[in-house]
Amino acid sequence: MQGIDVSYSDEVGFLTKGDRDWEDWIMQLLLMAKKEIGKDNAQEMSINFVDEDRSQAINRDYRDKDRPTDVISFAIEDGDDGLDLAMFTQDPDFTEDIGDLFMCPSVIERHSKEYGTGFDREFGYTIVHGYLHLNCYDHIEPDEAKEMFGIQGKVLEEYGLPLYPDQLDEGRGK
């Protein structure tokens, strides 16, 4: 399995908080999720850490929701154009640009308190959730949700950040 090239933009100084190597921690989760969904080709993406004002502006402008949110994903390939990436992935030099994540650490922190999950688990949930969206997973329909949340649950469990039992199929709710 080839890796993921992640470029970062950190408008809020998140990556330098504490003594954790956040980039390494994030990469471990991303690679586990990549393996779980069977993506062998090289990928690239960006992760942008933003404040609540920027998160709200993006959410309002692109999703018509006038509130800050934990993560917003902009997938390059949404699976709706009929393009078969398989013909490209056989090329050893092909790197799939999967898109961009905009993450708001202060909203993630607030969610961790609201849901009683702790920051690490909530952050892990959010990064894996966003990554799956960039890889054309969604949770609009019940069968899609079951698949997506099942993958999230497995990755987080293996990493030591388990979900609540009912989150494996239903999402975040307790």
Curated annotation (Swiss-Prot):
Keywords: Cytoplasm, Endonuclease, Hydrolase, Metal-binding, Nuclease, Ribosome biogenesis, rRNA processing, Zinc. SUPFAM superfamilies: Metalloproteases ('zincins'), catalytic domain. Binds 1 zinc ion. InterPro entries: MetalPrtase_cat_dom_sf_prd, YbeY. GO terms for cellular component: cytoplasm. Its EC number is 3.1.-.-. Zn(2+) binds at H129, H133, H139. One of its GO terms (biological process) is rRNA processing. It is found in: Cytoplasm. Its cofactor is Zn(2+). The keyword Nuclease applies. Belongs to the endoribonuclease YbeY family. This is Endoribonuclease YbeY. The gene is ybeY.
